[in-house]
Amino acid sequence: QIKRGVQIMVKESRRLTNMVEELLQFSRLEDGRFTLQVEDTDLQAELEDAVYSYRELFRQDGIALEYSSDRAEYSEVISGDPERLKQVFCNVLDNAAKHGGAGRRIDVSAAKEEDRMVIRVRDYGPGIPPEELPFVKQKFYKGSSKARGSGIGLAVCDEIVERHNGTFEISN
């Protein structure tokens, strides 16, 4: 029981730390202090690090995390902020786990499509109600979901991706 109690405390402290960080980032976005530390960044390496970091954590929760890539064909180095990009990947993976329902599986893929790198994260949950889909990237929007969270993460992700001249799309 002590071990289980410690596991719960660690998980909750991680959740609260993430929420505080999201609130701080939201505040920085609002007052213009949100900056990128741009350097040559291997986009797929950052994605692979996030997948690797979450794979074991998800496995412990009974969620399979699968990753596929055509990385052998090319390397995608961009001018970007590796920490912010990894933050996007981690936030999206966390959302997929929270909202994946009984699907218990998340698929991540990375591929070059025309002149863009396309990264897809797919969960097998019930999806977002169609009437809520246009609002999910708005700050503080939580919709009808009962899942934990601040409603800030996807808005921050959208801003980070936009500042990297990318697009952040969410669909069912």
Segments the model singles out, each with a brief description of its role:
Residues 153, 157:
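Short alpha-helical Gxxx[C/S/T] motif in the catalytic ATP-binding
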Residues 11-16:
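Short alpha-helical segment of the dimerization/phosphotransfer core of two-component systems
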Residues 57-68:
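Short conserved segments within the C-terminal catalytic ATPase subdomain
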Residues 31-36, 77-80:
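Conserved micro-motifs of the catalytic ATP-binding
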Residues 128-140:
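Short conserved segment of the HATPase_c
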Residues 96-97:
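Short helix-loop "hinge" at the ATP-lid/N-box region of the Bergerat-fold HATPase_c
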